[in-house]
């Protein structure tokens, strides 16, 4: 259910999913697992009814983790750019002959949706740091676009914000790989930390734009990068 009509609700209806506008305890089936986002408060009548009945209630990140269980899970995180990066990666994998499952926080034009159930064993998802819920994931690969201080109303300081990304790196499955942008100081520091922990780490940057915190050149150097606001090439 949602508070008001939207194109997303129309898309769900077209997919055969029953949706409700407005929140009401009567909307909750007695045998349902209830999935909530961080924005849903305990006072929400549907959540309150599920709690009263003793039904299973899980966060949407936990539901996503269950959906990705047993798959090669690629989680894309960062204060900025994670939606674009996860969408671009998803389309690149499709063009390469993979058929990944996808969960992105915006509509991908080629799909007409931000979600897609593929036939392959790769799952690409945008990982949200704003509420710390990305700590519910156990990715095979983590991509961090940047760790620029954000959501300080929750975290309180740059140090605390960077620490949650350190914790995120700790969620990597054994033998997993961390990919970090070497141009951003926060992600560069994260890469250096990960290497001290013996984690397979790959950094990338445009030629000559590496952060001093990287301590050297990036592993992958991007040359002749161009963008027109709609497409990019290098």
Give residue spans per PLM region.
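Short polybasic amphipathic segments
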Residues: 232-234
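N-terminal beta-loop-helix "entrance" segment that forms/cooperates
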Residues: 3-20, 109-113
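Beta-strand->loop->alpha-helix junctions that form or flank phosphate-binding loops
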Residues: 2-4, 20-23, 58-65, 102-106, ...
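Compositionally biased, intrinsically disordered low-complexity segments
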Residues: 31, 172, 223-225
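Phosphate-binding loop of NTP-binding sites
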Residues: 13-14, 27-29, 38-200
């Amino acid at each position: 259910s949602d508070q008001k009509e939207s194109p997303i609700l129309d898309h769900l209806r077209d997919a055969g999913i029953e949706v409700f506008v407005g929140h009401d305890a009567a909307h909750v089936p007695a045998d349902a697992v209830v999935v909530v986002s961080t924005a849903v408060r305990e006072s929400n009548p549907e959540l309150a009814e599920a709690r009263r009945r003793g039904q299973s209630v899980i966060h949407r990140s936990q539901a996503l983790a269950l959906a990705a269980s047993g798959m090669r899970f690629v989680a894309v995180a960062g204060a900025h750019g994670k939606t674009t990066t996860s969408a671009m990666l998803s389309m690149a994998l499709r063009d390469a002959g993979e058929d990944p499952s996808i969960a992105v926080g915006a509509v991908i034009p080629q799909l007409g949706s931000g979600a897609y159930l593929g036939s392959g064993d790769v799952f690409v998802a945008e990982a949200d740091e704003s509420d710390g819920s990305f700590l519910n994931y156990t990715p095979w690969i983590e991509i961090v676009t940047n760790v620029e201080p954000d959501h300080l109303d929750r975290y309180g300081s740059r140090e605390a914000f960077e620490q949650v990304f350190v914790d995120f790196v700790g969620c990597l499955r054994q033998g997993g790989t961390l990919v970090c942008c070497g141009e951003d100081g926060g992600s560069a520091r994260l890469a250096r930390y990960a290497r001290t922990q013996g984690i397979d780490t790959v950094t990338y940057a445009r030629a000559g734009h590496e952060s001093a915190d990287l301590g050297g050149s990036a592993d992958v150097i991007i040359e002749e990068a161009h963008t027109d606001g709609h497409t990019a090439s290098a």
